[in-house]
A protein has these predicted regions:
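N-terminal active-site segment of His-dependent metallophosphoesterases
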Residues: 1-68, 72
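Active-site neighborhood of phospho(di)ester-bond hydrolases with catalytic His/Asp-centered motifs
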Residues: 6-7, 43-48, 76-83, 103-108, ...
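Metal-dependent catalytic neighborhoods of phosphoester/phosphodiester hydrolases
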Residues: 14-16, 47-67, 81-101, 106, ...
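Accessory, non-catalytic peripheral segments of nucleic-acid enzymes
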Residues: 37, 42, 254-326
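Active-site neighborhood of divalent metal-dependent phosphoester/pyrophosphate hydrolases
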Residues: 40-58, 76-88, 175-198
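Conserved catalytic scaffold of divalent metal-dependent phosphoesterases
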Residues: 92-195, 235
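Binuclear metal-dependent phosphoesterase catalytic core
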Residues: 112-124, 129, 229-292
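Conserved beta-sheet core of the metallophosphoesterase superfamily
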Residues: 182-260
Length: 326
């Protein structure tokens, strides 16, 4: 079976005053094209589907468009909530969606829900864990000592029967770290050593029973601890710190013979996000200007503050998001 792993869509997000809905539709259409090219069986969406707990109408319509397109292609969808999402809003209509093989787990109810499928000699079980806090999980396991995010996730997995004869996938939205090292945090909210976006660190070893772990929460694509525990990263650049990142989705092929094979499929945005630095006159010189429709963060090295620098800059780069000085 072939799966496409993505996460951190942040539908409805803005860059400064700029609406990204058109850019997000463009990248989702690109992902739909990849599902056709690669004959994808299922799409794993690892949380932060929306950018805000109360998403805009445009954001909800865009998600509907994406899910309906996947359903029309008979592609299964496995989607969990992230810390940016409203559990109840994302869960709305989940029972109806399930009839079209769109499986949504947005509210933790004490059970790590699973969907199982057989493909030839391979049985694949996809487990879905929405974003959870210790206080939510403690209620369901009163005999467990749960005081942290790590405790909470370990308790859930410990109380779940996992058949190791299957190929087991987990879709989860949390801050997961390796032994002695943290993930690269470009664009991923705050960057504390023990938490990201107020989400505490979880040890990757709690996922030992899973053949592949589809992570969401960190915007930079990367493995954590072992090859089969992956952050897909966000499909678009959402902050200046992501300017040098290359965006992609993870293509996962699972078979009884070869186990789990992981490939990266690059994504190309409609408009890139770039950080440029130099004197204003040099940056706006025609010979130095390229892709003027890109989203631009500019750092000026002029010795004096330039009057209405933003207005001047936007005459050449209309989608300039921010200007600062060095």
């Amino acid at each position: 079976m072939k799966f496409l792993h993505l996460g951190d869509l942040h539908l409805g997000k803005t860059l400064g005053d700029f609406d990204l809905i058109e850019d997000q539709k463009y990248i989702l259409d690109q992902i739909l094209h990849i599902t056709e090219e690669e004959s994808i069986d299922g799409v794993l969406i690892a949380g932060d589907v929306y950018d805000k707990s109360v998403p805009s109408e445009a954001a909800t319509k865009l998600l509907d468009y994406f899910l309906i397109a996947l359903a029309a292609k008979r592609i299964k969808v496995f989607m969990v909530s992230g810390n940016h999402d409203s559990d109840e809003r994302l869960n709305f209509g989940s029972t109806l969606f399930a009839s079209n093989q769109i499986f949504i787990s947005a509210v933790f109810d004490g059970t790590l829900h699973r969907q199982s499928f057989v493909d030839g000699d391979t049985e694949v079980a996809v487990y879905m864990l929405p974003f959870v806090k210790a206080s939510q999980v403690r209620h369901y396991f009163p005999d467990e000592d749960i005081n942290s995010y790590d405790d909470a996730v370990r308790a859930i997995i410990r109380n779940t029967l996992i058949d190791k004869r299957n190929k087991n996938i987990l879709v989860v939205h949390q801050f997961v770290a390796g032994k002695g090292e943290d993930p690269a945090l470009a664009g991923s909210e705050s960057v504390g050593t023990q938490s990201v976006g107020m989400v505490e660190k979880i040890g990757y070893d709690c996922f030992d029973d899973f053949d592949y772990v589809a992570l969401g929460h960190i915007h930079s694509p990367q493995k954590v601890g072992r090859e089969e525990i992956m952050y897909a990263g966000s499909p678009l650049k959402y902050s200046r710190s992501e300017a040098n990142n290359e965006k992609s989705v993870c293509l996962i092929t699972i078979s009884a013979e070869e186990g789990v094979k992981i490939e990266s499929v690059p994504l190309k945005p409609m408009r890139d996000l770039r950080h440029i630095k130099g004197k204003l006159k040099e940056l706006l010189d025609k010979k130095n200007v390229k892709a003027p429709d890109d989203f631009i963060y500019a750092t000026l090295t002029d010795e004096e503050i330039i009057n209405d620098a933003m207005g001047v800059f936007q005459q050449t780069y209309p989608n300039t998001v921010r200007i600062d000085y060095d």
